[in-house]
């Protein structure tokens, strides 16, 4: 019904306009350097293209006031050193960061995370994923890649194939496609899941990426510069 569709579109537009999605960029002190400035800025610039992201916060254990990110629209939140230990998880970092944000009376409708190691991420994907949270009754959605190549699990001397549908694999050993999570590419969830550290529990959905080039990982500026002219 045209009139009903028009009403639903208007309702969604209002919801979209009022929705407050915040994004956290977790960066360890070792990576908060001028050598990695391109990776940091490319992530920030990509997030800024989304009209649905209302605030960007860098969560870091970098001890000095940062001159690396001179941007009034980017909040720097200093976190304890122990949140960079191997025993700590992304959920620990997000929980601490959200608590610091909310302690000033600043609350959001959804919270997302983006790591600097994906400098070629597509800003349109960010919009699509936030809209999924708006439009569907789910707890968390994260970026992913559908892998057709053979995927193995285990130690080198005890490997077991868990998936793969490539023609290079013998037909009797094809187990279907596997989904590789790209959580650091972009993940969006609800604040309650961050507070309760249940980001990856409940009703979870993946958002399959179509352009493999946008999933390339660069862990420093040297890798970024080597690839930049090729893409």
Functional labels for PLM-detected ranges:
Residues 1-17, 178-231:
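Conserved alpha/beta core of the MobA/IspD/sugar-nucleotide pyrophosphorylase nucleotidyltransferase superfamily
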Residues 60-65, 192-194:
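Short, polar loop motifs at secondary-structure junctions
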Residues 63-112, 120-124, 128:
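Short phosphate-binding loop-to-helix
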Residues 8-60:
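N-terminal glycine-rich phosphate-binding loop and ensuing alpha1 helix
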Residues 34, 84-90, 216-218:
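Short, charged, surface-exposed secondary-structure boundary motifs
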Residues 92, 96, 116-210:
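Conserved core of the sugar-phosphate nucleotidyltransferase
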Residues 82-86, 149-151, 212-215:
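A short acidic, often aromatic-flanked loop/helix-cap motif at beta-alpha or helix-coil junctions
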Residues 53, 106-108, 135-139:
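Short, high-confidence coil segments that cap the C-terminus of an alpha-helix
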């Amino acid at each position: 019904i045209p009139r009903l569709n028009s009403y639903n579109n208007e309702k969604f537009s209002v919801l979209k306009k009022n929705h407050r999605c915040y994004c956290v960029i977790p960066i360890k002190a070792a990576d908060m350097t001028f050598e990695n400035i391109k990776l940091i800025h490319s992530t920030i610039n990509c997030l800024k293209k989304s009209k649905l992201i209302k605030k960007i916060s860098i969560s870091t254990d970098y001890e000095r006031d940062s001159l690396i990110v001179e941007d009034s629209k980017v909040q720097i939140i200093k976190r304890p050193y122990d949140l960079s230990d191997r025993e700590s998880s992304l959920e620990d970092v997000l929980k601490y960061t959200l608590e610091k944000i909310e302690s000033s009376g600043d609350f959001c409708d959804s919270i997302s995370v983006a790591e600097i190691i994906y400098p070629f991420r597509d800003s349109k994907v960010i919009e699509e994923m936030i809209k999924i949270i708006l439009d569907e009754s789910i707890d968390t959605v994260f970026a992913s890649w559908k892998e057709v190549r053979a995927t193995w699990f285990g130690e080198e001397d005890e490997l077991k194939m868990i998936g793969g549908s490539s023609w290079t694999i013998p037909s009797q050993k094809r187990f279907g496609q596997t989904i590789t999570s790209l959580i650091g590419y972009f993940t969006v969830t609800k604040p309650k899941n961050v507070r309760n550290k249940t980001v990856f529990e409940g009703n979870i959905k993946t958002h399959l990426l179509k352009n493999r080039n946008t999933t390339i990982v660069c862990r420093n500026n040297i890798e970024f510069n080597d690839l930049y002219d090729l893409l």
